[in-house]
Design a protein with these regions (language model features):
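N-terminal low-complexity, Pro/Thr/Ser-rich intrinsically disordered segments
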Residues: 35-102
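Surface-exposed patches in mature extracellular/periplasmic domains of secreted proteins
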Residues: 127-150, 227-233, 252-257, 296-314, ...
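Post-HExxH zinc-binding segment in Zn-dependent metallohydrolases
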Residues: 224, 229-272
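Bacterial N-terminal signal peptides that target proteins for export
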Residues: 2-11
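Juxtacatalytic substrate-recognition/specificity segment
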Residues: 81, 85-219, 223-224
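Beta/coil-rich, acidic/histidine-enriched accessory regions frequently appended to metallopeptidases
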Residues: 44-47, 60-76, 315-399
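Bacterial signal peptide processing site
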Residues: 24-28
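C-terminal motif of bacterial Sec signal peptides marking the signal peptidase cleavage site
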Residues: 19-22
Length: 399
């Protein structure tokens, strides 16, 4: 699914001080450790000064490549990025071990270096949280994530669509996962991260670094599902907020969000206001993965197995032999076995084939259990489904 994502910068951080681990959820990568190669910062409240004071690690500086000929390819994903515009993208990139960082709209090389450094710091934490291999490139072992930094982004923290209001987005691109984020030099940085004294210090889950943990988790999930994308919004956002450790808030606020709207709609779309829905998505992942009382105990490190089940069902539904005489769209053969093409590949930017939604539903129903019986996902699957009983289950699970 070519969905768009941004890490909400909650202005009411003091009111949402209960972290996931305090809710029995088993949070993801920690706020410290595995920060290999991290640059250093000087205390400041100004985004521009923060960037100027940032000491880029030598290993990242050595990854700068000039006259780069590769393209930031969005394909038919839902992302509209200025890094895909040859008139606006720089020919200089930072090609780090797990990510290639592009720059649009005059973003500086230092913008790119900071983004590469923070992404590389996030990678081992995400791998640990999901139980992925600690070796190889990116999250699938072979492919670098493509990331665009753009100072024009961040005028708001909207979730979908295009324009400058996006702070971060991730999607399944043609051949590589693509991400775009607000550059650290953005004039909108202070509004998104008010009072920031460092990219990595501050309230865990609300730092600029956590934007990279958040979008990096999306990138990991898309990498594991290549070439199909998909996966419902509640799952994607719940996983990203879990690994990035977004402060969850009170039990009452989570239950109010669940009661206010259907957060697990059968069409897979995001539901409700993201400012309140994020913690509820996070709590739902905690419910599924935690071994605390009321949790289903699936384990966060088993999530890649669930994604593999989804990918297998998507392959079964979407892979067809290329008919004799047909030359399929190249976008439909990316990541497919020889002689097969992906009939579920998006025919228009951002489109999600219904067969992918069905595959996700089937994978969930075949994976998760409750009291020894399959836990069905949607109300259409059964009266005791997660969608139909989410309020009751979270009420029993959250302390």
């Amino acid at each position: 699914m070519n969905t768009h994502h941004t890490l909400k910068t909650l202005a009411v951080a003091a009111a949402v001080s209960i972290a996931l681990s305090a809710c029995g959820g088993g949070g993801g990568g920690g706020s410290s450790g595995n920060n290999t190669g991290g640059g250093t910062t000087t205390t400041t409240n100004n985004g521009a000064a923060l960037l100027a004071a940032y000491a880029v690690p030598a290993s990242i500086a050595a990854d700068v490549v000039t006259n780069y000929t590769g393209a930031f390819n969005v394909g038919n994903s839902g992302i509209q990025s200025n890094c895909a515009n040859t008139a606006l993208v720089s020919t200089t990139v930072v090609s780090a071990p797990d990510v290639v960082v592009f720059a649009a709209n005059g973003a500086s090389v230092k913008d790119q270096e900071v983004a590469a450094d923070l992404f590389e710091q996030a990678v081992p934490q995400i791998r640990t949280a999901l139980g992925l291999s600690t070796t190889g490139t990116g999250f699938d072992g072979t492919t670098k994530v493509q990331l665009c930094v753009d100072p024009n982004l961040g005028t708001g923290d909207g979730e979908t669509g295009s324009g400058t209001s996006i702070t971060g987005q991730t999607a399944q691109g043609p051949g590589a996962v693509i991400v775009q984020v607000m550059a650290p030099s953005s004039p909108n940085f202070d509004a998104r991260y008010p009072g920031a004294t460092s990219y990595t210090d501050g309230t865990v889950g609300l730092r600029y670094f956590d934007l990279f943990r958040h979008e990096g988790t999306h990138a990991a999930l898309y990498s594991l599902a290549e070439p199909f994308g998909g996966m419902e919004a509640w799952f994607q956002e719940g996983m990203a907020t879990t690994v990035a450790q977004l402060p969850m808030g009170s039990k009452a606020s989570v239950l109010a969000a669940v009661q206010a709207t259907d957060l697990l709609p059968a069409n897979g779309a995001a539901a409700g206001d993201m400012g309140t829905s994020y913690p509820a998505y996070e709590a739902t992942i905690g419910l599924l993965t935690s071994s605390a009382p009321g949790g289903l105990g699936y384990g966060l490190t088993n999530i890649p197995d669930f994604v593999a089940t989804y990918k297998a069902k998507a392959m079964a539904a979407c892979a067809q032999a290329i008919p004799s005489g047909l030359t399929p769209n190249p976008l439909s053969t990316v990541g497919m076995p020889t002689g097969l093409y992906n009939v579920c590949a998006p025919a228009a930017p951002g489109a999600v084939d219904g067969r992918l939604e069905t595959a996700f539903d089937q994978a969930f129903n075949a994976t998760f259990t409750s009291n020894g019986a399959p836990l069905l996902l949607h109300t259409a699957d059964g009266a005791d489904s997660l969608e139909a009983t989410l309020y009751q289950r979270l009420s029993a699970f959250l302390p």
